[in-house]
């Protein structure tokens, strides 16, 4: 279907002149960015004219728009094209945007600033907003714990512990920290049970929220020091007096006495109350029994996020020595997210707490093992720096001496295992098995292997160590330690995995947001455009002469493009309030329109006699097929020109015109117009 185009209306008048001026400026800017050959100093575009011959336009097809047309363009403001159905309604009529707090919560509920301003209503007579008195609207929407005028849920709120957004609040009338964690109707309050996760001795009000925020902050680093277990313990000790630590020591001693075979360090505290305070309790218990030894190597314990403990006596379990596990010196208390496992030794405790709060062994540096950490691994062998194990100890991470070691005359160590429901960490003494003879303790290698992580450690083909007869700790046939080190079962990992999934979803959402959603009304038209007109482009180029020296003088060359021949396929798409336009390459043009018409036209023109020579040269999709150019150098004197048709300059200019056209107007490049 042919389309008649009123060429004079499009190109004439002030609008046509402005459009021609913009095209001239555009071509001039492109020539300034082109690297010029040595013999041309500069190129300047002076004028552009559309001419009087219109192009021939034929509609070929109506299809769906190309996918690239739906891509968001940051340079174009899309706020003006937002439709009413895409705008999110504000939840509450009359909410205002003066208050920064209101702005924060308004955006969290999904309301845009412009929509909020449009729906802003103020009662000018009383000066109140959604309230019964002056500034009641401002005060009512503050967070409940910052609102001194909040009445505890009186009025329309059905639940006294919910604010207007359905969030729990702490009753402002509750004194101290001993009140319920989430309002007066919270029935868990302070029950003192280590399994409910709401209370810890010395921390009234519970530590369930404290643990969650603190241990997550080890990976996100978003909380201040006042929200750490150390600060909570200090605050509790300040409230209850200096006797609190003594009570903890007494409780620790009672737990130690529960272990068969003698004193054990036991797990210290519950629900994140580990760290230095528990370390002090364990150290005091061990000191009273005289178990410090200055002749043993030092074992340095470090509490991530809390501080570094002092070196305490005891051999390193990762060095080449074959020291019983039970004779580790005094160690710090177990941190941990809540309940878990504690290992008690002779008057001390070998902490096996779960990261990020369990003590991390800082072994003297030796040959290091480097590996790439995986996203599924929190506790990594690569996080430590152990020395190379002795050959006799390569069958397990914690290796033992031979079973024929001479019996020890000293009291045998006791190991307490306290198993909780939420991983490895703090939890008091448990039932322990007693090693009554001299053989050393050994933990099989597969019991401490790391799951769900990528490691370059070569697997040990020797299998499990045969020194099981002298070990009274555990047998890993049931995969007990495998469960200990299954990171996905740990609350911290369970919390991190959804965060990773959320990050992936956000990335996918951002990728989807780069493209708009197609609509039924989106349309695209495919045209075949033929043009053999008298479009004019005037430009000058300065030619440098190298005689008698390089770049001796520059001579201006005037170039005039007086017409061109064009045959191509154009695409115009209308998407919402934008119009996209481009030409297709010759290959895409043939695929979109078909080459049969082009073949028929070529054969028809070839059969003609003496006519249609221009038509025989045209090829559909060939775009710029011919450019007519005139050039002259110097000034006219007595009707003569000094020089015409400088070949090199003409070829360079025509080549650049073709390149600019193809780079700027041929798909995947396209032009967008706001309508």
From Swiss-Prot:
Ranges of compositional bias, category Gly residues: 261-270
A Gene Ontology biological process term: phospholipid transport
Location of the region described as Disordered in the Swiss-Prot/TrEMBL record: 66-186, 241-270, 307-327, 365-390, 444-517
Membrane topology field: Peripheral membrane protein
Keyword Kinase recorded: no
GO molecular function, one term: lipid binding
Keyword field: Endoplasmic reticulum, Lipid transport, Lipid-binding, Membrane, Mitochondrion, Mitochondrion outer membrane, Transport
Compositionally biased intervals (Polar residues): 373-382, 454-469
Localization, UniProt: Mitochondrion outer membrane; Endoplasmic reticulum membrane
Segments of skewed composition (Acidic residues): 78-101, 497-510
Residue ranges of every copy of the SMP-LTD domain listed in the record: 1-675
Domain of life where this protein originates: Eukaryota
InterPro entries: Mdm12, SMP_LBD
Biased composition annotated in UniProt, kind: Low complexity: 123-137, 317-327
One Gene Ontology cellular component: ERMES complex
Known function: Component of the ERMES/MDM complex, which serves as a molecular tether to connect the endoplasmic reticulum (ER) and mitochondria. Components of this complex are involved in the control of mitochondrial shape and protein biogenesis, and function in nonvesicular lipid trafficking between the ER and mitochondria. Mdm12 is required for the interaction of the ER-resident membrane protein MMM1 and the outer mitochondrial membrane-resident beta-barrel protein mdm10.
HAMAP family for this protein: Mdm12
Domain free text: The SMP-LTD domain is a barrel-like domain that can bind various types of glycerophospholipids in its interior and mediate their transfer between two adjacent bilayers.
Similarity-based family: Belongs to the MDM12 family.
The protein's assembly and partners: Component of the ER-mitochondria encounter structure (ERMES) or MDM complex, composed of mmm-1, mdm10, mdm12 and mdm34. A mmm-1 homodimer associates with one molecule of mdm12 on each side in a pairwise head-to-tail manner, and the SMP-LTD domains of mmm-1 and mdm12 generate a continuous hydrophobic tunnel for phospholipid trafficking.
Protein name: Mitochondrial distribution and morphology protein 12
Gene: mdm12
């Amino acid at each position: 279907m042919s389309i008649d185009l009123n060429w004079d209306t499009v190109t004439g008048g002030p609008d046509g002149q402005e459009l021609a001026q913009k095209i001239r400026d555009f071509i001039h800017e492109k020539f300034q960015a082109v690297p010029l050959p040595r013999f041309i100093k500069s190129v300047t575009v002076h004028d552009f004219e559309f001419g009087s011959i219109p192009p021939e336009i034929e509609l070929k097809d109506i299809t769906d728009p190309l996918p690239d047309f739906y891509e968001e363009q940051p340079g174009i403001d899309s706020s003006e094209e937002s439709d009413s159905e895409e705008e999110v309604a504000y939840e509450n009529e009359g909410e205002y945007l003066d208050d920064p707090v209101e702005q924060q919560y308004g955006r969290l509920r999904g309301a845009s600033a412009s929509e909020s301003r449009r729906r802003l209503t103020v009662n000018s007579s009383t000066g109140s907003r959604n309230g019964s008195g002056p500034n009641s609207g401002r005060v009512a929407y503050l967070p409940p714990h910052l609102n001194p005028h909040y009445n505890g849920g009186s009025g329309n709120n059905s639940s006294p512990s919910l604010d207007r957004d359905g969030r729990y609040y702490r009753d402002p009338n509750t004194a101290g920290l001993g009140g319920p964690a989430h309002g007066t109707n919270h029935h868990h309050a302070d029950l003192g049970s280590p399994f409910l996760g709401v209370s810890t001795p010395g921390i009234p009000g519970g530590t369930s929220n404290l643990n969650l925020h603190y241990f997550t902050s080890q990976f996100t680093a978003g909380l201040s020091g006042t929200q750490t277990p150390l600060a909570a313990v200090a605050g509790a000790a300040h409230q209850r007096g200096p006797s609190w630590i003594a009570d903890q020591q007494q409780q620790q001693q009672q737990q130690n006495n529960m272990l068969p075979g003698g004193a054990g360090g036991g797990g210290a505290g519950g629900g994140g109350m580990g760290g230095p305070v528990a370390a002090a309790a364990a150290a005091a218990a061990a000191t009273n029994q005289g178990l410090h030894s200055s002749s043993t190597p030092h074992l340095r314990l470090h509490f991530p996020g809390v501080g570094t403990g002092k070196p305490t006596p005891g051999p390193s379990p990762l060095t080449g020595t074959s020291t019983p596990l039970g004779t580790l010196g005094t160690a710090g208390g177990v941190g941990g997210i809540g309940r878990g496992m504690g290992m008690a030794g002779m008057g001390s405790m070998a902490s096996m707490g779960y990261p990020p709060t369990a003590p991390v062994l800082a072994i003297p540096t030796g040959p290091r093992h480097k590996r790439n950490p995986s996203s599924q691994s929190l506790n990594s062998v690569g996080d430590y720096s152990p020395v190379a194990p002795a050959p006799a100890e390569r069958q397990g991470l914690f290796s033992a001496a031979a079973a024929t070691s001479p019996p020890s005359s000293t009291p045998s160590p006791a190991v307490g295992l306290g198993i909780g429901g939420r991983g490895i960490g703090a939890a008091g003494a448990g039932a322990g098995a007693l090693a009554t003879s001299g053989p050393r303790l050994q933990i099989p290698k597969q019991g401490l292997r790391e799951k769900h992580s990528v490691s370059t450690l070569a697997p040990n083909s020797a299998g499990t160590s045969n020194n099981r007869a002298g070990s009274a700790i555990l047998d890993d046939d049931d995969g007990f330690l495998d469960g200990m080190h299954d990171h996905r079962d740990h609350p911290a990992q369970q919390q991190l995995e959804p965060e990773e999934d959320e990050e992936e979803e956000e990335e996918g959402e951002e990728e989807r947001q780069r493209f708009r959603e197609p609509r039924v009304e989106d349309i695209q038209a495919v045209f075949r455009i033929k043009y053999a007109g008298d479009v004019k482009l005037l430009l000058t180029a300065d030619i440098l002469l190298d005689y008698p020296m390089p770049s001796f003088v520059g001579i201006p060359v005037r170039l005039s493009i007086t017409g061109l021949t064009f045959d191509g396929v154009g695409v115009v798409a209308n998407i919402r309030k934008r119009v996209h336009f481009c030409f297709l390459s010759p290959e895409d043009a043939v695929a979109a329109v078909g080459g049969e018409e082009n073949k028929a036209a070529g054969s028809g023109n070839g059969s003609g006699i003496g006519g249609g020579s221009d038509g025989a040269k045209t090829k559909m999709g060939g775009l710029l097929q011919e450019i007519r150019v005139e050039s002259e150098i110097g000034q006219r004197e007595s009707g003569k020109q000094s020089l015409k048709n400088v070949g090199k300059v003409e070829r360079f200019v025509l080549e650049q015109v073709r390149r600019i056209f193809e780079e700027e107007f041929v798909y995947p490049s396209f032009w967008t117009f706001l309508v």
